[in-house]
């Protein structure tokens, strides 16, 4: 079965694959972030959003994976075999979970549309030859301010007219006073 965990959120494994593996924070940092920002919602018996549900599931999967790793570490006698298992878990499964955790935490923090815009912007940036692209990659936290990709159905932001300068009222008064004195 080929299951894409991002499909229902409008993204895909392919879209996230444009981000390099060292882009994603460590599992520990992601778990700390999720706990600091969303602990109450994650521990709540009530349904908050599909992102909260996916985040709960990813956290539970990571916990079970750590239980398995602990069991393997305690039951595998051969240090070389143990190292192979730990390495496989960290490289393959760890990366997938880091991607999933990052995606859902980012969607909850910045909004799904902003994260999708970021993934598209980064994908375009990374595939553009170095000579033709800006030196710095797009940054998620600044994307809403200078996004090239516009949301559908949203009109571009209009500029606010600059405030008119107020003229001093005193010259008018003087004129009217001087005219009044002439008459």
Swiss-Prot record:
Q: Where is this region: RNA binding?
A: 177-183
Region: 3 X 8 AA repeats of S-P-R-R-R-[PR]-S-Q, residue numbers: 155-177
Instruction: Please list the GO terms describing molecular function.
Output: DNA binding; RNA binding; structural molecule activity
Q: Which InterPro entries match?
A: Hepatitis_core, Viral_capsid_core_dom_sf_HBV
| Major localisation | virion
| Modification after translation (UniProt) | Phosphorylated by host SRPK1, SRPK2, and maybe protein kinase C or GAPDH. Phosphorylation is critical for pregenomic RNA packaging. Protein kinase C phosphorylation is stimulated by HBx protein and may play a role in transport of the viral genome to the nucleus at the late step during the viral replication cycle.
The protein's assembly and partners: Homodimerizes, then multimerizes. Interacts with cytosol exposed regions of viral L glycoprotein present in the reticulum-to-Golgi compartment. Interacts with human FLNB. Phosphorylated form interacts with host importin alpha; this interaction depends on the exposure of the NLS, which itself depends upon genome maturation and/or phosphorylation of the capsid protein. Interacts with host NUP153.
Q: What name does this protein carry?
A: Capsid protein
Origin species, per record, is: Hepatitis B virus genotype B2 subtype adw (isolate China/patient4/1996)
